[in-house]
Amino acid sequence: MIETATDVETSPSPLVSAHPAWSCRWCSSQHGVRVLDAGLQSPSDLHPRPSDPAPDPEYPLVMVMCLDCHLVQLESDPTTPEEPRGLEPSALVEQAEAAIKDAEADGYLRPGMRVLEYPSPHGGSWVEQLGRRSLVEVSEGPADLLVDIFGMMHDADQRAALTSRVSQMSPDAILLMQFHTVAAIVRTGFWNALRHGHFAYYSTPVLVRMAAELGLTAITAREYPLYGGTIVLALAKTGSRWGDQGEGVTSLIESEIADGVLEPEAVASLNDSLARSAAGLKRYVSEAKSRSETVAGYSAASRASALIRCGGVTAHDLVAVADASVGLHGRTMPGSRIPIVSPDDLVSARPDKVLLFVPDLLNEVRQALPEIEQNGGRWVLLDPMPREIDSTVSD
């Protein structure tokens, strides 16, 4: 029998030291503790074909906090790097537009500036929008503006990654780093932000300190609602014309420290979030099944795989998971082998409930698939507990 998070007690447990072979991805310290253990999980971008041999490969998925620099990070990752999956959610496009407008208002954008972008496999690129403002994309420095959109977290060697970015900056350059802050991850119980291929999880105080070690000063920080709390931090070389650390940065640092982002015990509350959300998912689909309701899912993202695995949900519970990426159609979710289908196939199935594994997609999918609610179905957000959304269709 596979143990699932539904079997796990939610009472606090003593923190366990990181694996003896672990060393910090920033400071090389070997003093760390495990703050989240998601058990065995498949690689983040694995979507096997129905005919592929089973069982699917699984590896430990563990989050560690360094006790010296407090960087939250992936303990180990034997998987291969993930690859982009194509379609870009509108939530990421909207986030890019909002952040670019703010960067423009802060004086960081000028026509003719040389821009170097460090993208991630998840989309959210700023290149097109910056091009419309007459900024010039380059493939190497020195650059006047460097943009990192959830990019550096994919680098196993964090010090080398940030050092490389600093080396590409002109004397008065700005480095804009967008990241899903640990404060939001803990506050919202977003434990399944943890995944193979995501080597680092930043809090604002830790990232500001990392940057300072390499001669950078945090000038401004802006917060956005994406993923429950996304930060865009503006960094400049210390002593440049941009001046000292901004008051907004200092205020955000103080706020996040008060939230406990430097305290392993506070971050370890994610284990309770995992247990509650996994149990809640299993209970929800079991109750729906007892009412003879058809339940499906939407978004074959890695966070969905982790939640399905921890909840012990199978193809007997979910008839399918729909995804807009054509390359995933005909494949399955790892471990559970739940079929991945097209949005059109989801509509044809006429599900009573559709579990939305990425809540930020709600407005987008409701607009794209009005038939779900028109046919009497309901969207159910997993954020992280199941929450049914009232239908927009009038009786």
Description of each model-found segment:
Residues I2-E3, D7-E94, R222:
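N-terminal juxtadomain amphipathic helix
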Residues D172-H180, R378-P384:
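Conserved beta-strand signature within the Rossmann-like core of class I S-adenosyl-L-methionine
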Residues A143-D157, P359:
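A short SAM/SAH-binding and catalytic strip from SAM-dependent methyltransferases
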Residues A160-I174, P370:
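A short glycine-rich, Lys/Arg-flanked "PGG" loop and its adjoining helix->strand segment in the class I
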Residues L46, M177-A200, T204-V206:
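Short, glycine-/aromatic-enriched active-site segment of Class I SAM-dependent methyltransferases
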